[in-house]
Amino acid sequence: MHSDKGQTLPIYIWLTGILLFAAFAFFAFAQAASARNGAQSAADAAALAAAQDARDELLDGLVEAMGQDEDWLDWLDGDLAQGAGATAAAQQLAAENDATLQGGAVPTEVNGYPGYEVAVRTNYTVGESVIPGTEGMHANAHATAVIQPRCDIGPDVGPEKAVELDCDGEIVDIDPENFELDDLPDASVLFSVHLAE
């Protein structure tokens, strides 16, 4: 009987060690998942910031085109955004989420709509764990945000005529002959910005 207890103790110690290692390994995977989630949140925020900056630029271009009697309706397609401040906007949002933008905000196209793709890397690491090397590992993530026009333009509309736009149910009236800046709604009414699926 005494010898049976002596044989059980090493098995108990061995099983306890395995359970502890499994718990630490699970914690390491949880740390890595948390870092990945943080990186993805930073990438999403950076991509949205880049696209929103370009959307604001579209509104500025629309106003300028009206002032110079150009075909301002072209700006409502969303294709004319140059995204001059897109990278700076993406960098700022990445930094606010404790990450660094890798490269810049890269113009892209998704289903015919303009957008911006970004890549970020977390400034923090996964942290120390039972898995070697995690203390120096950073999480990386990518995201793409799209600018999508929200307004329907009729086929008989011209840049010199008064226009009634249906922007996802919100009616916007623009008369280029009697135009004031206050006539324009917020850029979010004319263009939606969302993450690419």
Q: What feature does the model see in each segment?
A:
Residues 2-82:
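Alpha-helical assembly-interface signal, strongest on the long, hydrophobic N-terminal helix that forms
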Residues 48, 99, 148:
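Residue-level marker of positions within ordered structural domains that often coincide
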Residues 49, 117-121, 140-144:
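Soluble periplasmic/extracytoplasmic beta-strand elements of cell-envelope proteins
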Residues 52-126:
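Short amphipathic secondary-structure patches
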Residues 127-197:
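Low-complexity, S/T/G/P-rich flexible repeat/linker segments used as non-globular hinges
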